[in-house]
């Protein structure tokens, strides 16, 4: 019976995951990510102001990226219990307004994989744009991907006809 009970480490990991899943939007919305509204393209929106969250996934877990969000050591680094050390920031590109990226503020070097096949090391102070098809490999070597649903031309034409 004892082996069926969650260990202290299991409980701590669960609490850290719950803390990372809790969202506080600038508009005043507070809640877990399941309360965000799913969009057709795979993104999520704040139910109060419509702020868009982009899902970065490793196949099992996801990190929701949006302007002003932070990534923590428990998500990107070597310590799965550290929910206090910031390792990444979601920031707007200074030259291209409306384009956001993940800025590395950790001591480690990340690796970015771009949709066109380019690979780039991302040291402290550098970043990778949040583009559909991009991937990032954090310090531990785990690859996280952003894959949104592409609208087909036929579907887009149908939507255009409905709005006319």
Each model region followed by its residue ranges:
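Terminal C-lobe "cap" of eukaryotic-type protein kinase domains
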Residues: 2-22
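C-terminal boundary/linker segments immediately following FHA domains
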Residues: 113-164
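Cys/His-rich microdomains that often coordinate metals
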Residues: 29-40, 52-54
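Short cysteine-rich clusters marking metal-coordination/redox-active sites
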Residues: 24-28, 43-49
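Short domain-boundary/entry signatures in modular proteins, especially
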Residues: 15-24, 51-60
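N-terminal beta-hairpin/loop module of FHA
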Residues: 53-95
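Asparagine-centered strand-capping/turn motif at beta-strand->loop junctions
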Residues: 102-106
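Short, solvent-exposed loop/linker segments at beta-strand-coil boundaries, enriched for Pro/Gly
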Residues: 108-111
């Amino acid at each position: 019976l004892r082996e069926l009970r969650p260990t202290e480490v299991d409980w701590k990991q669960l609490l850290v995951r719950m803390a990372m899943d809790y969202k506080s939007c600038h508009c005043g919305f507070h809640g877990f990510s399941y309360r965000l509204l799913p969009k057709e393209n795979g993104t999520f929106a704040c139910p109060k102001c419509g702020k868009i969250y982009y899902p970065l996934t490793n196949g099992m877990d996801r990190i929701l990226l949006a302007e002003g969000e932070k990534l923590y050591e428990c998500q990107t680094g070597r310590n799965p219990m550290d929910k206090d050390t910031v390792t990444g920031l979601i920031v707007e590109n200074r030259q291209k307004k409306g384009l956001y990226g993940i800025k590395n503020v950790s001591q480690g070097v990340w690796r970015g994989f771009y949709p066109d096949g380019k690979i780039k090391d991302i040291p402290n102070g550098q970043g990778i744009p949040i583009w559909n098809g991009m991937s990032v490999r954090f310090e531990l070597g785990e690859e996280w991907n952003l894959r949104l649903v592409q609208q087909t031309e036929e579907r887009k034409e149908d939507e255009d006809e409905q709005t006319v």
